[in-house]
Curated annotation (Swiss-Prot):
GO terms for biological process: cell division; protein import. Its main location: periplasm. HAMAP family: TolB (MF_00671). This is Tol-Pal system protein TolB. It comes from the Bacteria. The gene is tolB. One of its GO terms (cellular component) is periplasmic space. Belongs to the TolB family. The Tol-Pal system is composed of five core proteins: the inner membrane proteins TolA, TolQ and TolR, the periplasmic protein TolB and the outer membrane protein Pal. They form a network linking the inner and outer membranes and the peptidoglycan layer. Part of the Tol-Pal system, which plays a role in outer membrane invagination during cell division and is important for maintaining outer membrane integrity. Residues 1-19 form the signal peptide.
Amino acid sequence: MRNIIYFILSLLFSFASYALETINIEHGRADPTPIAVNKFNADNSAADVLGHDMVKVISNDLKLSGLFRPISAASFIEEKTGIEYKPLFAAWRQINASLLVNGEVKKLESGKFKISFILWDTLLEKQLAGEILEVPENLWRRAAHKIADKIYEKITGDAGYFDTKIVYVSESNSLPKIKRIALMDYDGANNKYLTNGKSLVLTPRFARSADKIFYVSYATKRRALVYEKDLKTGKESVVGDFPGISFAPRFSPDGRKAVMSIAQNGSTHIYEIDLATKRLHKLTDGFGINTSPSYSPDGKKIVYNSDRNGVPQLYIMNSDGSDVQRISFGGGSYAAPSWSPRGDYIAFTKITRGDGGKTFNIGIMKACPQDDENSERIITSGYLVESPCWSPNGRVIMFTKGWPSRAKAPGKNKIFAIDLTGHNEREIMTPADASDPEWSGVLN
């Protein structure tokens, strides 16, 4: 966000060691850290309304992470607000608040708002973080997400993921279903439709810059086109007409290339396209179905699924197609692998069969499974769970969750998120049914 100006308060804030133990978000479930997000002080009524809304967004971000427990304002003892005073720490400890956020909102002559916050450790009575932002009124929500990101990063040691977007397929609740590409904030706010619903659309993907998306659209039942849409200008163009394509491309970390699967002559293979020259390079061979390629964060490897040995399993190869290695060995069939932005894990869909029929699972495995033969871990299961994608910090997975048709009611799909530990599963609210989420990087 170029029009947000940062002023790091390096002379005022001491980032010394503090009493709170840094939250480790990989090792099981920890009790959420109690935090008080105090009323933001304001210099006029407009700033007061904006500050009130920001406190709600910041508190909601921290609560949704599962790592913080915002304390109700009804229990606050100290009545002072703002950043100009030192808190009465004993009063905050009395209500078991380990952390305290104080803030201030001022309206500037330019029409922008100056937003300041300080994060306090109430146990050691020290400032942990603080920042000043200047934002136009329409970007107040992003400013709130950025403050929550700073708090999350200071306490967990990992970058936050709140100032991000989700692109997904919106599905009407009536039959026949109308599918549209939609865009929203990570928490479901600011939902916006990007296509008109006149044609079938599938698998939206962000470009690396997050200001463009790519998706597949079926102009006819047999002809699939890959479209590029600029989110700033709204302009749309056809990237290519690839007969046999069923999923939108996934992009290399440098944004210069993309990988996709294309079906031809009874087989489906992985191809890499140079986005500048539009030249295709075939990466897999033989007979079989090879789909769902995803780059490693450094762009040197590609993970995909293939039924070359009879049942769909996961494989890794070099980005030029060499050195193919199978990485999944469990029962069931595997699909939709997605490499974590951190490079440590690969998320996947796994379908198993039992006496009760098919079960869908979302799992994760180490990207180098030879280091741990039992690295596979299922984190959620259901009638339909599929299409996992990662938060930009590699600590949360978003996915599609579906329910079957009952009586005269059609089945439905919704978007859910879950921590990589398998805890804190929650629905991301959307206006209609939703599927195929894709998570952007943190916005600029």
